[in-house]
C-alpha cells in the first residue's frame, strides 16, 4: 500500500498501481502489506483480501488458546488470561480406561465381553462429547474469532507408554471440530504450535531447557511467567501479526511479522497492563506485609477461570 494506491508487482522492477480511493469499504487503521492477501485480478474486478483485525461483528475479541493435558488457557489484551479446567474431561477417559482394561483381554474370546467393551467405549464417547460441547460453549461465549494450536498426535508420541496414553486421551481435535462447525472456518484460525511454550513472549528468546517446568524463565529479559500463559500470549501474537517459518542451523524457527516494530515495547504497552490490571501489584501470599512480589509469576492469576460444576452439570465461572 502506498497511500490510497495498491502497488502490484508484475515482474521485477515493473509495477501496476490500483487506485483504491473510491472504494466503498474502510481499510483497517494499521493496515500493511502483511495485512493484505494476494490480489485476484479479473477483467471486471479486483478481489483484494484484507485482514480486518481480531474483533468480530458481535464486538467480542479474538482469543488464542493453548491446549494442555488438564487445562485450556486463552489470552487476548481485552480479556487477559482465561483458564478452563479440563481435568474432569481427562478423568472420564482415565476411569473408562480402567473399566475397559478389566474386560479387554477377554473381548477377543468372549462375545459377551466384546459387548461389554463396546458399551464402555460408547459411554466414554458420549460423556466426553458432552464435556467437549460445554467447553466449546464457554470458548464461544468469551470470544469472537479463535486461534487454536494445529496439534497432531502422531508427532507427539514417544517411547513412554504413560505419556502416549495421556496424549491419546487428548480431546483437542474434537473441540476444534466443534468450534469450526459453530464459528465457521473463517472464525477459527489454526496456528503452528512449534515453540509456543519455549519462546519468550516478550523478547523472543528461546528456552532450550524448559523440560516440563511450570514457570517459564527467560534468559534474555528475565521474564518469569506461567508456562501456559506464556504459550497463549505467543499464540495470540502469531494470530494477530502473522508469522513465517524458517530453518536455521537445522532447527525450525517461527518469526513474527511485526513490520520492524519493537516486540518488547509492544509487550510492555499492550500485554503487561492486561495482566496486572494497569496497576503495580505488591503482594501474593505474603509472609510479611512489606514483602514484595518477586515477579509476574507470583502476581498474575487468571482473570476468568471456568471449571466443571457437578451440581449444575455445566462449566461455570469460579472466583479467582
Question: What is the meaning of each model-derived region?
Answer:
Residues 1-41, 86, 169, 173:
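Acidic carboxylate diad motif detector
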